Amino acid sequence: MSNEDLKLKVAKEAVKLVKDGMVIGLGTGSTAALFIRELGNRIREEELTVFGIPTSFEAKMLAMQYEIPLVTLDEYDVDIAFDGADEVEETTLFLIKGGGGCHTQEKIVDYNANEFVVLVDESKLVKKLGEKFPIPVEVIPSAYRVVIRALSEMGGEAVIRLGDRKRGPVITDNGNMIIDVFMNIDDAIELEKEINNIPGVVENGIFTKVDKVLVGTKKGVKTLKK
């Protein structure tokens, strides 16, 4: 069974949590994209009244494609946010997100939801946060040099994320740059705050406020809770 099959299993299970009348946070990434598709199918088939709040331009375009009505945080609170992750620490359910460069908008929606549910396949589970992925840090462009210096002084190895199909740095939906920092994570809660306290940092990709993780495995979907 491929990772894509496991992601689809999780997406189908997650859609069952959606009830008529809910406002849903629509995450970004491959698993979140499958969830958006399955949610659109369920809304159409069951004639549900469900609204979505997208966490990125990509999520917005997918929601429009699958005819999910969209609203904003200015108008509504979020009942449940569904989002993916680059890696999940099994014992704490702390996450690293932001491989797609959308972690600022994701965190705004996810942290302000009544419930934050993470959707992953089993390959995303790690024993220690930071095992596979760097911490993405969104930075105001004029501050990139001083932010890199501050992260280096904290013991990190910081590099500007460059575009795959363009010259120069990746630019986020907010018009900012991404710095990827490789560093030891002993206290994720404290490090999340510490990085955000650096002047010029918009937001980082450590997520510590998670309610539930749905994990796609070859034996089925398992639920992890704190």
UniProtKB/Swiss-Prot annotation:
The entry's keywords: Carbohydrate metabolism, Isomerase
Q: Which SUPFAM superfamilies match?
A: D-ribose-5-phosphate isomerase (RpiA), lid domain, NagB/RpiA/CoA transferase-like
Gene Ontology, cellular component aspect: cytosol
Q: Which domain of life is it from?
A: Archaea
Q: Where is the active site?
A: E106
Q: Which GO terms describe its molecular function?
A: ribose-5-phosphate isomerase activity
Quaternary structure annotation from Swiss-Prot or TrEMBL: Homotetramer.
Similarity section: Belongs to the ribose 5-phosphate isomerase family.
**What's the protein called, per UniProt?**
Ribose-5-phosphate isomerase A
Which source organism? Methanocaldococcus jannaschii (strain ATCC 43067 / DSM 2661 / JAL-1 / JCM 10045 / NBRC 100440) (Methanococcus jannaschii)
User: Per UniProt, what is the name of the gene that codes for the protein in this document?
Assistant: rpiA
